[in-house]
């Protein structure tokens, strides 16, 4: 039995750089001198020598590899082990972020290059890997089975050496079968999707998508060089093989996941290169008269950036103050600065939400949602007696009822045949400033869906008084003024990103009191 060390000795002792064989086997504290103290006490001084450490795998020499391969030559050749070797990795240069990506770095280029490399691996290295990894862990087992299927069953362009590898492959392939564990089946499916769709050098969708607020775009030839059919094909094959053999609830994919739309390179290129033409609300009313028309016709994306540019141009023109005294011109300039500050408060949120969209599919979905809601609210406005105007979050009018057109003296074509903003109908600058101040309160954060306010709307200066409806006294009093004051209630309809998508404004005119009307 060894002597117990005192606390002072334990504090002053230093660990040996390498223990001897006896101390290593008995788990004793060895010393640096040879023979060590433990071996001298036990009369084993002549046998005291340093223990031989195991060499790391990457330090093994070629002769050592050759000897081990000679000793274990009876093990079958497994090309998948060579494929999963951690020491041989085909180098793929990653391009800079500001360079045009070559098509060889896109899609399944990594998988294609690795499929061509197994016949170039050293056979001794593969046999050594099969020796040391006789009991594979779960992840390696899943990857081996998946890659074995993909590389040797779904590849038609292999050369003669790859065919010989297929002939010598052992009969342990799973074919269309699955693992005995449901958890392994789930991991098999998830890892397969990661491998088949891994694009380490491809840019993210946020970089490749065309944003209206960012001028840095990818070269137009980039999307035309991507073969999207090759990207979708392996996923369909894997899901088709495992679709009928998974009796448990799928956590990664649904049954409809194999029916994903084909991402055609020509469609992507056309949608990103062709600018969106403006379609007036009067035209869209004829195109989408029912819900079936929305799903049968091609939805035309609404260009929100261009609408904001037109709004900015209108505000600058409205508040320019030309041919006005210096004081009034300065007051208009101050009102314009207030409006621009209000727009700048919620503009970053709108930009960040737009950048996360997958263009043009998300834009089409949002426009379909808008047109679908517009049909419902137009039907509701026909059943409601209050005059109604519906406009987008940019302020562009998309619908107006006939009774409000009659009050203001406009025709439907005057407002909906071109881009018309709700601010253009406002009589004074105070109403416009108040509009943006109220819109800011519901644009971001505050999810209140209604606003109650007063507003002045201007009437058509070229209106025909004989076309006005109502009593003679009411028509006369309305015709004498160039604007009408309304009590207005706004209902805000939001999209899937909680941004204001549509504003439904109901306007009740404040009529002048007659002789027999009591004022409270």
UniProtKB/Swiss-Prot annotation:
GO terms for cellular component: nucleus
Residue ranges occupied by any PAS domain in the UniProt entry: 376-445
Gene Ontology molecular-function annotations: DNA-binding transcription factor activity, RNA polymerase II-specific; RNA polymerase II transcription regulatory region sequence-specific DNA binding; zinc ion binding
Keywords: DNA-binding, Metal-binding, Nucleus, Transcription, Transcription regulation, Zinc
InterPro entries listed in its UniProt record: ERT1_acuK_gluconeogen_tf (IPR050335), PAS_13 (IPR056751), Zn2-C6_fun-type_DNA-bd_sf (IPR036864), Zn2Cys6_DnaBD (IPR001138)
UniProt key word Zinc: yes
PANTHER family assigned to the protein according to its UniProt record, in alphabetical order: GLUCOSE STARVATION MODULATOR PROTEIN 1 (PTHR47659:SF8), ZN(II)2CYS6 TRANSCRIPTION FACTOR (EUROFUNG)-RELATED (PTHR47659)
Record's protein name: Glucose starvation modulator protein 1
Source organism per UniProt: Scheffersomyces stipitis (strain ATCC 58785 / CBS 6054 / NBRC 10063 / NRRL Y-11545)
Gene field: GSM1
